[in-house]
UniProtKB/Swiss-Prot annotation:
HAMAP family the record matches: UPF0173
Signal peptide: none
UniProt cross-references to InterPro entries, sorted A to Z: Metallo-B-lactamas, RibonucZ/Hydroxyglut_hydro, UPF0173, UPF0173_UPF0282_UlaG_hydrolase
Family statement: Belongs to the UPF0173 family.
Protein name per Swiss-Prot or TrEMBL: UPF0173 metal-dependent hydrolase BCQ_4418
Disulfide bonds: none
Record key words, sorted: Hydrolase
GO molecular function: hydrolase activity
Length: 227
């Protein structure tokens, strides 16, 4: 399984001849190396409904006839826009032809904000994502605070790589993320959701230096690891 980081919270997974994108915020993302018009994808996995995570989902899904796997309310909202969806919820899992997806808790918000009409649409509970294929497991925490049940994620799953937000302000910061890494018990930890905007500026190298009992890896946009 090949896993690539593409800035902010964008993660690409290639396995079993399929390509998946998690939280494809491409257009307007100053930290990504991808352009929506160049992306080919079989499935899109969404952690929650905020614009910097849903991003180019509708365009990519329609262009590629890709299924969007998302929390129930968000999946319903996107289905009304003509997107093929598979709704799930916290604690549920499903075996797809590209791998197994399970949604975990995340402590954050989830909504679609229409700036033009000044409306906010509730899009359900935010989630973390566990993805398993080729006997390897990836944990994408989504946007989240530190929470004690991360210990359960570590106890119940053999996590090979965890993508954890470190930006602070909207999510946990580096200090809390160090503890999250300990609780999740991932073999490799990759920081995400930082330096996209001034309010979430962090030094990812200082973060990985503080990690214990795991390998910290800072990935630049376009860099990958193989599990």
């Amino acid at each position: 399984m090949k896993v690539s980081y593409h800035g902010h919270s964008v993660v690409k997974i290639e396995t079993n001849g399929k390509v998946m994108l998690i939280d494809p915020f491409l257009t307007g993302n100053p930290k990504t190396d991808l352009k929506a018009e160049d992306v080919k994808v079989d499935a899109i996995l969404l952690s929650h409904g905020h614009g910097d995570h849903v991003g180019d989902t509708v365009e990519l899904a329609k262009k590629n006839n890709a299924v969007v796997v998302a929390p129930f309310e968000l999946a319903t909202f996107l289905s009304w826009q003509g997107v093929k969806t598979h709704p799930m919820h916290i604690g549920g899992s499903h075996e797809f032809d590209f791998g197994k997806v399970k949604f975990t808790q995340a402590f954050h918000g989830s909504s679609y904000i229409d700036e033009e009409n000044k409306t906010i649409t509730y899009t359900g509970m935010p989630a973390g994502i566990l993805f398993t294929a080729e006997e390897k497991t990836l944990y994408h925490a989504g946007d989240t605070a530190l929470f004690s049940d991360m210990k359960l994620i570590g106890e119940l799953n053999n996590v090979d790589v965890a993508f954890l937000p470190i930006g602070d302000n909207f999510t946990m910061g580096p200090e809390d993320a160090v503890l999250a890494a300990k609780w999740v018990q991932a073999k490799t930890v990759v920081p995400m959701h930082y330096n996209t905007f001034p309010v979430i500026e962090q030094d990812p190298y200082q973060f990985v230096e503080k990690l214990q009992n795991c390998t910290g890896k800072v990935l630049e946009a376009g860099e990958s690891i193989t599990l």
